[in-house]
């Protein structure tokens, strides 16, 4: 692949370069030697080219090497060849000269710079694969291909979170899934439950009804099966309800503030939980006789048993939340009065209006939602012997299965979408097929068939596409392809929308939804917030929970509260590798009851026990980036206690390195390394750099070990050891350093030190050999300074 023409700016000063990088309005890249950048451009490593290359070479005072009484200062653009060849460096800082001299080839060293070597992009081959083939963590992706892939040259000292793992990225509620699974692995069940409750106050519910998109982001996909997060969450949710007095407690202090929540569905319940946790008095109004919203009235009991929901709501009552049933906005309630009586109001009335087909004689058709509500209320009336359900979502599946279990002889689902893109959860579709439901994908309703004033069926027409080229819902049909479908009941389940008849003029709406800020759920009316399906349209329970939580946090902050929730991830934290997750294996699966045993009221799926979910937690990879820092200078400068000058600060070299998206440093946008300061080493210090690589020229280190020792009377008086290409950032071997002090170098001491160097190692499945290299280099370095026998 050739490099295309790029815009180029030759900076005349550091200030100009920084300003261009920050304020040009373009994506930029700095270039000096170019040995790293040009390779990534040539190979198409990134999804797009930078808009502007900023050339640093014309800037004065960035080159050169100065040696004085206080030490060495190497300009950022000093080349590695200059460092390796400088006799002053070879005499006083031989470690630095050796490290620079091992980089790549002579031709590259003539161009490559000190700062470039320190600031190079990640060298992992998944990151560097041409044509941007792997969208990994370090590119803003959601997984690390090396953990279960080819990892022979990757970290043997754990991973670092450089972003949210796929499971957490795909969870609308932002639950810290890897963190609570880590607690489970450690046997800390209570801590795991509390981590879930920080982001999801009803895991017993979501563990049953959420589509669990998190599993589609699992790092095990393509290897075996994703971790069964849904089953784990469900079991932990039931554990929380069994000990609700411990996990869902009333607040220790009362704020004196009163909040009204209108709507007792998942968004309203979520807001009520977090607001009550903050110490506010919360009253939840709902138009139905019992709280729960769609959770109670549209999700069948075979998926979400009513006693589970009842225990969840009882737990909120235990916390002090007050529920007022049969109170509806526009009837018993007015927004004006609520604003007068309460400090804040959260509107979460949901979407209860059945969307219409717009066909003649549509009044003869039934509502799928009404069927589910009737069954939830205890009615058991058969809708018909031959039932056609219009719709392809999970609600339509619930309607079809419910009709079948009520005794319908034949139940068929017709939907616009093709089979592979039906909006229902795939597992739900498979269950429908298992229960004898027939599918008619890519068929839409054309007309209602009527005989003697009664429903006789539907005429269906072939749907050729559901969306237009811009992704807007605009079905297209083939009028030449139609079919007649005989049915004595047609139930429409094509989605619901909010009832906005109560909305006052001061609350703006758009496309049938109430308008609220997506960040804090605030409406245009002060003190009034809104969320859930009322604002977003039909969405998942997890998304509604997240909206309720956002609103609660915003309301609390506006009232002067300090409600704080745990983080959804531990980005930038070092993670221990879970070696138990490396072998392939099957996920834990909760058993579905036999077809003959399934009913309208009984739950289909049994819980996993706590032992099973702890075993399932062992399959979690606790995903992080395992790419190593491949700089040869980095471990040498760590040992030499160097400091890095930038345009904004001077910092110890140990603080320079980080694991981030597209970067290996902590440098801010527009911040440029200007020089490296290295103090004079201790008198008589013995320095060395050892490097293992596949080829003696060109290749980056498989392992690099930098050492600096001082001895007095044959005894170590100081020791500094650093490992390169062994971990996501350069690593000081402090255990080795501490052990060596006061000891004489010997075979025995070297052997113990070598073992200490890898004592905390966590090799991956394919790179344990790197530990032998570390051991050998550490041992060799110690024995090299021993006095001859």
Features from the language model and the residues they span:
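N-terminal Rossmann-like FAD-binding beta1-loop-alpha1 element of flavoenzymes
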Residues: 257-283, 396-404
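A conserved FAD-binding loop/helix module that cradles the flavin
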Residues: 399, 531-562
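FAD-site-proximal beta/loop scaffold in flavoenzymes
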Residues: 363-385, 468-538
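Feature captures the FAD/FMN-dependent oxidoreductase FAD-binding
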Residues: 253, 258-260, 310-359, 447-459, ...
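Rossmann-like dinucleotide-binding cores of NAD(P)H-dependent redox enzymes
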Residues: 281-284, 288-318, 323, 400-447, ...
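C-terminal structural segment of proteins
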Residues: 1-175, 630-789
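Glycine-rich dinucleotide-binding loop and its adjacent helix/turn
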Residues: 236-252, 311-331, 354-406, 509-524
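Mid-to-C-terminal Rossmann-like scaffold of FAD/NAD(P)H-dependent oxidoreductases
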Residues: 430-434, 443-454, 466, 557-622
């Amino acid at each position: 692949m050739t490099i295309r023409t790029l815009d180029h700016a030759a900076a005349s000063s550091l200030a100009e370069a920084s300003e261009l990088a920050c304020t040009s309005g373009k994506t930029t890249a700095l270039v000096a030697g170019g040995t790293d950048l040009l390779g990534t451009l040539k190979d198409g490593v990134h999804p797009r080219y930078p808009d502007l290359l900023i050339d640093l070479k014309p800037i004065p005072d960035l080159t050169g090497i100065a040696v004085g009484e206080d030490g060495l200062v190497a300009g950022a653009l000093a080349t590695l060849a200059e460092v390796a060849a400088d006799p002053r460096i070879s005499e006083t800082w031989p470690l630095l000269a050796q490290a620079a001299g091992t980089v790549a080839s002579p031709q590259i060293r003539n161009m490559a710079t000190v700062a470039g070597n320190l600031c190079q992009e990640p060298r992992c081959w998944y990151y560097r694969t041409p044509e941007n083939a792997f969208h990994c963590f370090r590119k803003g992706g959601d997984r690390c291909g090396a953990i279960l892939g080819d990892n022979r040259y990757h970290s043997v000292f754990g991973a670092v979170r450089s972003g949210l793992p796929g499971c957490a990225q795909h969870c609308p509620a932002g639950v810290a899934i890897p963190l609570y699974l880590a607690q489970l692995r450690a046997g800390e069940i209570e801590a795991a439950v509390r981590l879930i409750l920080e982001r999801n106050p009803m895991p017993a519910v979501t563990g049953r009804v959420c589509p669990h998109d998190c599993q589609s982001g699992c790092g095990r996909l393509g290897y075996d099966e994703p971790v069964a997060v849904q089953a784990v969450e469900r079991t932990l949710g039931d554990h929380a309800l069994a000990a609700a007095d411990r996990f869902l407690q009333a607040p220790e202090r009362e704020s004196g503030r009163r909040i009204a929540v209108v709507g007792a569905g998942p968004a309203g319940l979520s807001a009520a939980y977090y607001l009550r946790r903050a110490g506010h008095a919360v009253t939840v109004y709902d138009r139905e006789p019992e709280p729960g919203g769609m959770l109670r009235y549209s999700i069948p009991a075979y998926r979400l048993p009513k006693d589970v929901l009842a225990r969840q709501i009882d737990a909120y009552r235990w916390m002090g939340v007050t529920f007022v049933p049969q109170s509806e906005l526009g009837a018993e309630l007015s927004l004006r009065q609520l604003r007068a009586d309460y400090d804040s109001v959260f509107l979460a009335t949901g979407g209860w209006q059945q969307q219409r087909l717009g066909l003649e004689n549509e009044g003869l058709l039934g509502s799928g939602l009404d069927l589910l509500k009737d069954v939830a209320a205890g009615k058991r009336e058969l809708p018909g012997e031959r039932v056609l359900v219009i719709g392809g979502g999970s609600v339509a599946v619930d309607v079809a299965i419910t009709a079948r279990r009520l005794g319908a002889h034949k139940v068929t689902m017709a939907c616009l979408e093709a089979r592979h893109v039906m909006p229902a959860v795939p597992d739900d579709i498979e269950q429908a097929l298992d229960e004898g439901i027939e599918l008619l994908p890519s068929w839409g309703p054309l007309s209602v068939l009527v005989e003697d004033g009664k429903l006789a069926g539907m005429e269906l027409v072939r749907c050729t596409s559901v969306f237009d080229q811009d992704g807007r819902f605009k079905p297209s049909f083939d009028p030449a392809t139609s079919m007649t479908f005989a049915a004595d009941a047609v139930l429409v389940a094509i989605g619901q929308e909010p009832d906005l008849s109560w909305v006052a003029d001061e609350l703006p709406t758009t496309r049938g939804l109430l308008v609220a800020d997506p960040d804090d759920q605030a409406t245009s009316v002060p003190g009034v917030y809104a969320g859930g399906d009322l604002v977003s349209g039909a969405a998942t329970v997890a998304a509604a929970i997240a909206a309720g939580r956002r609103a609660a946090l915003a309301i609390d902050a506006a009232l002067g509260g300090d409600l704080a929730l745990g983080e959804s991830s531990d980005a930038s934290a070092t993670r221990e590798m879970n070696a138990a997750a490396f072998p392939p294996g099957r996920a834990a699966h909760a058993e579905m009851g036999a077809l003959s045993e399934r009913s309208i009221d009984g739950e289909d799926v049994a819980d996993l026990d706590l032992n099973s979910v702890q075993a399932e937690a062992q399959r979690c990879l606790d995903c992080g980036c395992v790419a190593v820092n491949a700089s040869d200078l980095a471990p040498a400068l760590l040992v030499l206690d160097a400091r890095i000058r930038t345009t904004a600060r001077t910092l110890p070299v140990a603080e320079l390195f980080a694991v981030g998206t597209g970067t290996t440093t902590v440098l801010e946008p527009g911040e440029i390394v200007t020089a490296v300061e290295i103090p004079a080493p201790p008198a008589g210090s013995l320095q060395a750099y050892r490097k293992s690589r596949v080829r003696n020229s060109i290749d980056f280190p498989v392992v690099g070990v930098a050492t600096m020792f001082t001895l007095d009377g044959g005894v170590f008086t100081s020791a500094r050891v650093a490992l390169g290409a062994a971990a996501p950032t350069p690593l000081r071997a402090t255990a080795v350093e501490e052990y060596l002090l006061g000891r004489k170098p010997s075979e025995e001491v070297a052997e113990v030190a070598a073992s200490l160097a890898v004592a905390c190692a966590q090799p991956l499945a394919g790179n344990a050999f790197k530990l032998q290299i570390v051991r050998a280099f550490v041992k060799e370095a110690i024995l090299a300074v021993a006095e001859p026998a």
